[in-house]
From Swiss-Prot:
Catalytic residue list: C83 (nucleophile), H184 (charge relay system), E186 (charge relay system)
One Pfam family matching this protein: SNO
Name of the protein in question: Pyridoxal 5'-phosphate synthase subunit PdxT
GO biological process: glutamine catabolic process; pyridoxal phosphate biosynthetic process; pyridoxine metabolic process
Upper taxonomic lineage: Bacteria, Bacillati, Actinomycetota, Actinomycetes, Kineosporiales
GO molecular function: glutaminase activity; pyridoxal 5'-phosphate synthase (glutamine hydrolysing) activity
Organism in which the protein naturally occurs: Kineococcus radiotolerans (strain ATCC BAA-149 / DSM 14245 / SRS30216)
């Protein structure tokens, strides 16, 4: 018997909200947008899209979502952060704005805008065996993206860059039910990263 579709929210303050919603629905979830505390309380998991991490941090406070979201993460809410979402989930940030705060939860140190300006963005196919399960690699599109400088012992490294000046840098991690990627899978039409996250949420809901 197939388990019911989990309800996964997409934080709708900035970023590729529609693309994330479409990828989640293709992956078998019921996707909803989240802008208010009441909407956040009704989800089984959450996606933090890309955008500008300092702006999202400020908007989380404006919409009074920040503390509630920190509490839900501490309680075990599955969360997937892409690009700026990775920064928001990180416990430590290098090259952040002076007053920038994160939600935390991932025992990683990330470097903000590690790939440089938007014109210095990077593309690379990533094997991601835990997600692709023997299939073709995932297209990684990095736009002013962070990378992980250091990862704690409980953090699973899912992908590193294999070429270019940043070869060896960590660009996808998982710790418990928290998932983060430096790249933007939502804009490639490949829903496998989102499908993987939907499975994470489904397993959490099933207990």
């Amino acid at each position: 018997m197939t388990s019911p579709a989990p309800t996964i929210g997409v934080l709708a303050l900035q970023g590729d909200v529609r693309e994330h919603v479409a990828a989640l629905e293709a992956g078998g979830a019921r996707a909803v947008t989240v802008r208010r505390v009441a909407e956040l309380r009704g989800v089984d998991g959450l996606v933090l899209p890309g955008g500008e991490s300092t702006t999202i941090d400020r908007l989380l406070r404006v919409f009074e979502l920040r503390e509630v979201l920190r509490e839900r993460i501490a309680e075990g809410l599955p969360v997937y952060g892409s690009c700026a979402g990775m920064i928001l989930l990180a416990d430590r940030v290098l090259d952040g704005a002076p007053d920038q705060q994160t939600l935390g939860g991932l025992d990683v140190t990330v470097r903000r805008n590690a790939f440089g300006r938007q014109v210095d963005s990077w593309e690379e196919d990533l094997p991601l065996p835990e997600i692709t399960r023997g299939g073709p690699p995932v297209e990684g599109i990095f736009i002013r993206a962070p990378w992980v400088e250091e990862a704690g012992e409980e953090v699973r490294v899912l992908a590193r860059l294999g070429s270019g000046p940043a070869a060896g840098r960590i660009v996808a991690v998982r710790q418990g039910d928290l998932l983060a990627t430096s790249f933007h899978p939502e804009i490639t039409g490949d829903d496998r990263v989102h499908r993987y996250f939907v499975d994470v949420v489904r397993e959490r809901v099933a207990g």
